[in-house]
C-alpha cells in the first residue's frame, strides 16, 4: 500500500491590519492554486482567519507603531517570535511567507532560511525611501520578494534578491470608477452637499496625538462651509470609545461615525483628510483629493527625519514621484493649516480632474490580479524546494 504524501504546510505571519488584508488576498490565491488539504497557519488577523487560517498567536500582539513606542513591547514580541521559530524549526513548513512587518519577519526568516526552509516575503520594505543597509538584511533572509510596486524589483535584483512584481490587491478590489452616490446611500448620507471623510488613525497613540488637531480643523472647516458634513469610520468599538471625548467636545459638528466601512466612507466623500499610511493609497485608488498628515512623538519624528531621504511620506506622492497631494506633518499640522489645505482640495475642480487622471493611471499600473500572481510565485518556490537534492 502506497503511503499518502504529507499535506503541504504554509506558515505565514502578518503583523498589521494592512498585512492581514494582503495575506487574506494571498490565501485566497493559494487555496485555488495549491492542493486541497494544504495547511495554513502562523500569526494572522481576522481576515486571514476568515479564510480558514489557523492563527497560533493573535496579530494584535505585533501591531505596535513607532521606534520609541515599541520599546516596552519588545520582550513580549521577541518571546512570540522565539516560540514560533522553535515550532517551525521543529516541524518545518513547505514554505514560510512573511507579510510586511519586516522587523519581526526578517528576524524569523533568516534562521528559517539557514535551516533550509524556503522563505517568501510579501511587500518589500521601503528600501527606496530609507537610508541604511536594510537590503543586506533582506538578502540574508528572503529567497523571493513579492513586490506591490513596480519600481522595487530592479532595486532588489541589483542586490541579488529574486523578486516579482505582483501588483497591489487593493487595485483589484477597488473599481476603477467609484460609486460616490451609491456609497452615500449605503451609509445613509444625504445625496447632495459636500462631504469630507476624516481618518485620524486606529491606535490610541495616533488618536491622542492627531485626533484633537483633526477635530479642531473640522470645526474650522464647518465654520467656513456651514453645509459641510463629515464622515469618520471607526474600525472597532474600542476606537469609537477612544473618539467619544473628542466627539463630545465638538457637539456642533455635522459628523457621522460609521462602524468600520472605511472604504465606503472614503468613496462617499468629495475630499479626505487622512493620517499617513496604506489608507492613502486606498484614497488614491478611489480618485479622491486628499490632505495627508501625521504627528508622532518628537524622538520618533527625529529618527524618521534622519533616516528618510525621500521628500514625501504619502504613497500617492511616492508612486507619482512628486507632490500631487499636500502633506502637512508634525508641528506644521495645525488645525488652521489642515482646514485651509483640505478646503482647497474640496473646492479646486481643476485639481480634482488632474488627480483623477493621475490616480486612474496609477490604478491601471497596480491592478495585476495580485492574489493569483503572488500564489503562482509561492507555488513555484515550493516546487523548487521539492526539486532540491
From Swiss-Prot:
Protein name: Lipid-A-disaccharide synthase
Protein function: Condensation of UDP-2,3-diacylglucosamine and 2,3-diacylglucosamine-1-phosphate to form lipid A disaccharide, a precursor of lipid A, a phosphorylated glycolipid that anchors the lipopolysaccharide to the outer membrane of the cell.
GO BP terms in the entry: lipid A biosynthetic process
Domain of life from the UniProt record: Bacteria
Catalytic activity, as annotated: a lipid X + a UDP-2-N,3-O-bis[(3R)-3-hydroxyacyl]-alpha-D-glucosamine = a lipid A disaccharide + UDP + H(+)
Pfam assignment, any one: LpxB
Keyword list, A-Z: Glycosyltransferase, Lipid A biosynthesis, Lipid biosynthesis, Lipid metabolism, Transferase
Pathway assigned in UniProt: Bacterial outer membrane biogenesis; LPS lipid A biosynthesis
Gene Ontology MF annotations: lipid-A-disaccharide synthase activity; phospholipid binding
Organism encoding this protein: Paraburkholderia phytofirmans (strain DSM 17436 / LMG 22146 / PsJN)
NCBIfam families per UniProt: lpxB (TIGR00215)
SUPFAM superfamilies xref list: UDP-Glycosyltransferase/glycogen phosphorylase
Alphabetical list of HAMAP family matching this protein: LpxB
Positions of transmembrane segments: none
Enzyme Commission number, as recorded: 2.4.1.182
Family as reported in the entry's similarity comment: Belongs to the LpxB family.
Enzymatic class: transferase
GO annotation, cellular component aspect: membrane
Keyword ATP-binding found: no
Amino acid at each position: 500500500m502506497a503511503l499518502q504524501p504529507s499535506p503541504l504546510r504554509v506558515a505565514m505571519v502578518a503583523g498589521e491590519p494592512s498585512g492581514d488584508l494582503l495575506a487574506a488576498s494571498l490565501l485566497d490565491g493559494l487555496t485555488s492554486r495549491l492542493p486541497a488539504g494544504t495547511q495554513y497557519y502562523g500569526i494572522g488577523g481576522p481576515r486571514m482567519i476568515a479564510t480558514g487560517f489557523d492563527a497560533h498567536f493573535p496579530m494584535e500582539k505585533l501591531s505596535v507603531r513607532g521606534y520609541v513606542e515599541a520599546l516596552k513591547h519588545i520582550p513580549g514580541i521577541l518571546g512570540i517570535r522565539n516560540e514560533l521559530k522553535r515550532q517551525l524549526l521543529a516541524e518545518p513548513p513547505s514554505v514560510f511567507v512573511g507579510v510586511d512587518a519586516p522587523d519581526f519577519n526578517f528576524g524569523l526568516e533568516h534562521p528559517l532560511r539557514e535551516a533550509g526552509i524556503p522563505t517568501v516575503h510579501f511587500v518589500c520594505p521601503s528600501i527606496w525611501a530609507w537610508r541604511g543597509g536594510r537590503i543586506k538584511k533582506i538578502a540574508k533572509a528572503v529567497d523571493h520578494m513579492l513586490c506591490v510596486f513596480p519600481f522595487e524589483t530592479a532595486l532588489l535584483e541589483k542586490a541579488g534578491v529574486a523578486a516579482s512584481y505582483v501588483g497591489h490587491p487593493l487595485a483589484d478590489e477597488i473599481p476603477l470608477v467609484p460609486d460616490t452616490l451609491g456609497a452615500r446611500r449605503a451609509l445613509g448620507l444625504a445625496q447632495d452637499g459636500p462631504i469630507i471623510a476624516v481618518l485620524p488613525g486606529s491606535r490610541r497613540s495616533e488618536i491622542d496625538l492627531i485626533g484633537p488637531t483633526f477635530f479642531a480643523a473640522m470645526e474650522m472647516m464647518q465654520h467656513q462651509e456651514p453645509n459641510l458634513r463629515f464622515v469618520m469610520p471607526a474600525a472597532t468599538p474600542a476606537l469609537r470609545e477612544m473618539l467619544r471625548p473628542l466627539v463630545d467636545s465638538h457637539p456642533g459638528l455635522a459628523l457621522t461615525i460609521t462602524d468600520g466601512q472605511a472604504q465606503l466612507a472614503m468613496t462617499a466623500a468629495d475630499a479626505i483628510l487622512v493620517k499617513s499610511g496604506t489608507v492613502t493609497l486606498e484614497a488614491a485608488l478611489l480618485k479622491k483629493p486628499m490632505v495627508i498628515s501625521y504627528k508622532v512623538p518628537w524622538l520618533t519624528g527625529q529618527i524618521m527625519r534622519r533616516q528618510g531621504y525621500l521628500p514625501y511620506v504619502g504613497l500617492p506622492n511616492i508612486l507619482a514621484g512628486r507632490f500631487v497631494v499636500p502633506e502637512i506633518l508634525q508641528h506644521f499640522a495645525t488645525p488652521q493649516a489642515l482646514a485651509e489645505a483640505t478646503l482647497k482640495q474640496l473646492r479646486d475642480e481643476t485639481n480634482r480632474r488632474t488627480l483623477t487622471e493621475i490616480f486612474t493611471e496609477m490604478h491601471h499600473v497596480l491592478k495585476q490580479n495580485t492574489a493569483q500572481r503572488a500564489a503562482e510565485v509561492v507555488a513555484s518556490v515550493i516546487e523548487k524546494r521539492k526539486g532540491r537534492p
